[in-house]
Curated annotation (Swiss-Prot):
Record has Nucleotide-binding as a keyword: yes
Family: Belongs to the YajQ family.
Keyword field contains Nucleotide-binding: yes
UniProt cross-references to Pfam families, sorted A to Z: DUF520
GO terms of molecular function: nucleotide binding
Keyword field: Nucleotide-binding
UniProt protein name: Nucleotide-binding protein P9211_04811
Gene3D superfamilies named in the record: 3.30.70.860, YajQ-like, domain 2
CDD domains tied to this protein: YajQ_like
GO cellular component annotations of the record: cytosol
Origin species: Prochlorococcus marinus (strain MIT 9211)
Domain of life: Bacteria
Function, as annotated: Nucleotide-binding protein.
Length: 165
């Protein structure tokens, strides 16, 4: 029996599932009667999605379809950080959607402090863009996961738990 147990807390998403959701979104834009003539474009870059379309109304429709497709692909909607829309050349509307990936140092410190304040029997260490939580009891680690779940809702960030040993 192991003397200590641990798990990692990360903020990540499956990039291939996002690619699949964007492909489905593009297909629906080309087939839906209200979006077909809007001359809309959706580009997936490394850390953002750029949506370009003809009006605010079609932009809102495309946002809704994007969220719907992401939900069906089991992606957390918290990964999307919608920026305000802006007008671009040719009377078109453009919106940049940043993708949240990884824990920032500030966010990692907040999460670490929240767990250390409530649970004295576990240690939390920051490792780059993830957290490592170790403890002698699996029950303590389960309590830490509950605290992380509450903080996930408060701070509006997607969290996953990996390498539970």
């Amino acid at each position: 029996m192991a003397s200590t147990y641990s798990f990692d807390v990360v903020s990540d998403f499956d990039h291939q599932e996002l690619v699949n959701a964007i492909d489905q979104l593009k297909r629906e834009i080309s087939q839906r009667y209200d979006l077909k003539e809007s001359n809309s474009e959706v580009e997936l870059e490394e850390e953002k999605i750029i949506i370009t379309t003809s009006s605010d109304m079609t932009l809102q429709a495309i946002e809704g379809v994007l969220l719907q497709k992401a939900t069906k692909r089991k992606l957390s909607l918290k990964i999307f950080d919608f920026q305000p829309s802006e007008t671009s050349s040719g009377n078109r509307v453009r919106q940049i959607v940043n993708l949240r990936k990884g824990l920032s140092q500030d966010m990692a410190k907040k999460l670490s402090k929240a767990v250390r304040d409530q649970l004295k029997k576990v240690t939390v260490s920051i490792q780059g863009d993830s957290l490592r939580v170790t403890g002698k009891s699996k029950d303590d680690l389960q309590s830490a996961i509950e605290i992380f779940r509450k903080k996930e809702e408060e701070l509006d960030i997607p969290l996953q738990f990996e390498n539970y040993r």
